[in-house]
């Protein structure tokens, strides 16, 4: 138990262009070394590409991609009697969002397109359609949880 008082969570302000808090959080995930302007340029560029390629509302595509990439369960290590068990646990909503955003970013970075906004646009489109690196990561985490279902009685 911490001795100090609990520090309140800081609210993230919605982004100026679309008024979305989720998008603002994603910009913070993409940001490197505090360069917010660069992160904004990348994310807005990616959304412009998405709109150009699909003709759909880019925020809807973004929301669908995030929703598809969110994990439902994950495994946590639990030591019981000298053995480590991978125990499947449900993921809290805030962590679901954070993991989905992180996985989208990492999958985009590993892609082959020239610039980051093109990579991110490609990954968002793939995730919205249920494929791509972020979806592969989510399925891998779900498979691990499914394989270790027998240890679910060791819940935390």
UniProtKB/Swiss-Prot annotation:
Database matches in SUPFAM superfamilies: Ribosomal protein S7
Biological-process GO terms, alphabetical: translation
Coiled coil, from the record: none
Stored CDD domains: uS7_Bacteria (cd14869)
KW rRNA-binding (keyword) present: yes
GO MF annotations, alphabetized: rRNA binding; structural constituent of ribosome; tRNA binding
Pfam family, one: Ribosomal_S7
Gene Ontology cellular component list: small ribosomal subunit
InterPro entries: Ribosomal_uS7, Ribosomal_uS7_bac/org-type, Ribosomal_uS7_CS, Ribosomal_uS7_dom, Ribosomal_uS7_dom_sf
Keywords: Ribonucleoprotein, Ribosomal protein, RNA-binding, rRNA-binding, tRNA-binding
Function: One of the primary rRNA binding proteins, it binds directly to 16S rRNA where it nucleates assembly of the head domain of the 30S subunit. Is located at the subunit interface close to the decoding center, probably blocks exit of the E-site tRNA.
Similarity comment: Belongs to the universal ribosomal protein uS7 family.
Subunit details: Part of the 30S ribosomal subunit. Contacts proteins S9 and S11.
Name this polypeptide is given: Small ribosomal subunit protein uS7
């Amino acid at each position: 138990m911490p001795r100090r008082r609990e520090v309140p969570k800081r609210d993230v302000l919605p982004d100026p262009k679309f008024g979305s808090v989720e998008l603002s959080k994603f910009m913070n995930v993409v940001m490197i070394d505090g360069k917010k302007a660069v992160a904004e340029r990348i994310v807005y560029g990616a959304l412009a590409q998405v709109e150009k390629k699909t003709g759909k509302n880019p925020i809807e595509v973004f929301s669908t991609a995030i929703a598809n990439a969110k994990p439902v369960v994950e495994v946590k290590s639990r030591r019981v009697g000298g053995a480590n068990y991978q125990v499947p646990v449900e993921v809290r909503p805030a962590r679901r969002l954070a993991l989905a955003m992180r996985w989208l970013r990492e999958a985009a970075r590993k892609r082959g397109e020239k610039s980051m906004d093109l990579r991110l646009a490609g990954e968002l489109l793939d995730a919205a359609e249920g494929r791509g690196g972020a979806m592969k990561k989510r399925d891998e985490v779900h498979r691990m949880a499914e394989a270790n279902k027998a240890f679910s009685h060791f819940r935390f």
